[in-house]
Amino acid sequence: MVENIKSNITNIMKENQGESSLSKIVPSIIKKGIDNVNLDMFDDTTRNNLLNAAGDEYVKRGDFVQAVKSFLLTKNIEKLNEIGDIYSSRGQFNQAVEVYSLSYNFSQDKNKLIHCGEKCILEGHYSDALRAFSIAKDETRLINLGEICLEKEKIDVAIEVFAVLNNTEKLIKLGDKCLNENRLGYAARAYEIANNKDKLSSLGDVLLKSGLLGSALRIYELANNEMMVKFIRENFSEDQLGKFYA
């Protein structure tokens, strides 16, 4: 029994010595920065402990960029998600989605991304919701987001949603709507992503009639309408071609 006690005491002392050594090294890591420190001389366990300890210290200091770098090197999913939660609670959804996506690369667990995406919708951050659902490959939520964006007149995001979904029918329908409402930039974007040459040429005709020659030329080029491209280039000056839609 006495020998067992001695053995336990020895193990505890070794553990404390190890922790003491780590605590002495961590400040040096913090000072140099994760990108500039070399920990190759340590075994994997010690190296990971050092990096995790450094990551915790960075979090305390509010330096989440360095903290993320630390936890990425140790593939510490839990700690990465904690940082994502901090960003999300502050309304910094761009950063939250980025960190959750890094965690997702290791875990393949979509829950954090989906929860963040839904929170983004509630708070009107539709582009961030698009990123979250796209990374999670959640088609159902992307479809719903597209409809919400149409309802809220967030046309730019709606176009990108339908682009991710590769829904050419929705893109063309939305492009037609934008064309009818004289929102020509959005119409051009929708038709271009849908890769519909006929619609692009029709838009080019509208732009030409409106005197927006620079935009008309660009759209005809996208439509591979060589006849109209040649017509514009041979009949109008460079100054005239400087007119674009807003």
Q: Model-flagged regions — what are they?
A:
Residues M1-A246:
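Long, low-complexity, acidic Ser/Pro- and Gly-enriched intrinsically disordered regions
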